[in-house]
Amino acid sequence: MNRLIIIFFILFAKLSFAQKEIDWSVLADVEFTDLYIEEVDEYFLYPHFGPSVRELAGKEVIIRGFVLAIDPTQNYYILSKGPFSSCFFCGVGGPETIVELEMKSSKEVFIMDEVATIKGILKLNSDDIYQCNYILQDAVVYLRE
């Protein structure tokens, strides 16, 4: 009986700390307002994250998308809902359709539009205009397709 209880608690602990697989519809739980940033004399879209996104902040998530190799020499990659030809940077979709990748290993190399599933800690960014609104920290490749 004691053995059964121990096994139950181990399984419960594993499930409670497990990563959550999400899709892009979850990240769409955000609204934007124009915010003037004096430092750069421009208006930016300021995010107001919805409850389902705020619930994921600081948690490990898994998401599949197209890797955009923005600057591979600097290990700077973006995960996008769509390929480069139809991504946020080309005027299709909003900022909620991209996630900045802070890779755990600088040895990861991707090619443009490579489809990959990435695992990392989701950070919500509303203050730094030089980074994306969604950032995956300690990101690792979960699956390459």
Residue positions per predicted region:
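OB-fold and OB-like single-stranded nucleic-acid-recognition modules
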Residues: A18-E145
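Sec-dependent N-terminal signal peptides
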Residues: L4-K14
